[in-house]
């Protein structure tokens, strides 16, 4: 699973998820991509589940690029603990994804296979997604 090797601060602020993604809105490496149409946090487990769903459907054919990385930690307190007494312990890692960001890219397979593989991957993610193609240059 994807986790940072080392971080400066273990506990981060949650931050805001306003507006569209600034960069990474076009398909740059592969031929086809999966673009987020809503914003959300995507955990490292969800990214891994989507990757497995894609590669299994493509039967090891083609190439997959993961263009998001879970660099933000999130914390949680144990169930049954009252409010206060500081921030909870680090629970996991998330990738903040804004709308418009291309999260996964695929190349080396036909459009039908890529479309179905990315559709299966989108069912593993908490954001609404759409299939996008690389624009002709």
UniProtKB/Swiss-Prot annotation:
Binds 23S rRNA and is also seen to make contacts with the A and possibly P site tRNAs. GO terms for molecular function: rRNA binding; structural constituent of ribosome; tRNA binding. Keywords: Ribonucleoprotein, Ribosomal protein, RNA-binding, rRNA-binding, tRNA-binding. Transmembrane segments: none annotated. Part of the 50S ribosomal subunit. This is Large ribosomal subunit protein uL16. PANTHER family: 50S/60S RIBOSOMAL PROTEIN L16, LARGE RIBOSOMAL SUBUNIT PROTEIN UL16M. The gene is rplP.
């Amino acid at each position: 699973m994807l986790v940072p090797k080392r971080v400066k601060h273990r506990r981060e602020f949650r931050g805001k998820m306003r507006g569209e993604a600034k960069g990474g809105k076009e398909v740059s490496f592969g031929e086809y991509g999966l673009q987020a149409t809503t914003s959300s946090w995507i955990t490292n487990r969800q990214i891994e589940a989507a990757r497995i769903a894609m590669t299994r459907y493509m039967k090891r054919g083609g190439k997959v690029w993961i263009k998001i990385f879970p660099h933000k930690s999130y914390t949680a307190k144990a169930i049954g603990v009252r409010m206060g007494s500081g921030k909870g312990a680090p629970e996991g890692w998330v990738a903040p994804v804004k709308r418009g960001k291309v999260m996964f890219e695929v190349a080396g397979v036909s459009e039908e296979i890529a479309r179905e593989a990315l559709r299966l991957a989108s069912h593993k993610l908490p954001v609404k997604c759409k299939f996008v193609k690389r624009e002709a240059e």
